[in-house]
A protein has these predicted regions:
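Amphipathic alpha-helical polymerization modules
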Residues: 1-237
Length: 237
């Protein structure tokens, strides 16, 4: 009877892990159209005692680059993240470069987080360009001299796959990811472009089907255990 109870406990544990993994698959599919979204994968680790632990890892593979007509759209071509700051001073990191000019004139994310330390676009800006090294250049009229008004920073991490999902397609640091370091490069940023999600629909659906089969097997095992319990109770009576 003790062995049967242990089997049931392990099966419940394993089923819980399967449901958690299914939740991450659903989130990945939901964000298929989200700019620069990075899928999360739930890695199952079988312990010596037969129980399953789970670890969350971020798939940092770069998504395809899509050309845009919006000068505020910026893509990272390579590794790295944009540091962005909330109104409360919280810092998170994103690859989603679908920026805008905020009501205060600063370069902002679509949900009003400030990019970097703050890059204010002049009210009389005729046009601006964002160079591959992140420098933001403003022109106040046609034929005028360029004026550098700031630089969009890029940072990197020792273990970016250990970053955790934060607020609205942003990432937060963890002990495993390490602290951010400024990337010093003349390349890496592309204006008039956005990165698409790296979600692979076929892989996610394949994982979902395997999870479904695994959960069906777990439920069948629970039914077998329940039948055995019922028979043992009847024999005792």
């Amino acid at each position: 009877m003790y062995n049967m109870q242990a089997i049931v406990r392990k099966n419940i544990n394993n089923t819980t892990m399967q449901f958690e993994k299914l939740g991450y698959i659903a989130t990945n599919l939901t964000n298929y159209s989200t700019s620069a979204y990075k899928t999360s994968r739930f890695e199952q680790i079988l312990r010596e005692d037969g129980y399953i632990d789970g670890a969350i890892r971020t798939n940092v593979r770069q998504g395809d680059i899509r050309i845009s007509r919006d000068p505020y759209d910026v893509a990272i071509d390579g590794h790295g993240y944009f540091p962005v700051v909330s109104a409360d001073g919280e810092v998170q990191y994103t690859r989603d470069g679908a920026f805008k000019r905020g009501s205060n004139g600063y370069l902002m994310t679509s949900d009003d987080w400030m990019v970097g330390d703050g890059i204010k676009i002049p009210a009389n800006c005729y046009k601006f360009e964002i160079r591959p090294n992140g420098d933001v250049i403003s022109y106040d009229k046609a034929g005028s001299l360029p004026e550098k008004i700031g630089t969009i920073p890029l940072v990197e991490f020792d273990s970016p796959e250990s970053l955790e999902q934060g607020h609205n397609n942003k990432m937060v640091i963890t002990e495993e990811s390490g602290m951010p370091r400024i990337i010093k490069s003349d390349q890496g940023i592309r204006q008039y472009a956005t990165e698409v999600s790296n979600t692979n629909i076929y892989d996610e659906i394949n994982d979902m089907m395997r999870m479904n089969s695994s959960m069906i097997a777990s439920m069948q095992l629970m039914k077998v255990a329940n039948d055995m319990y019922s028979k043992s109770i009847n024999i005792t009576e």
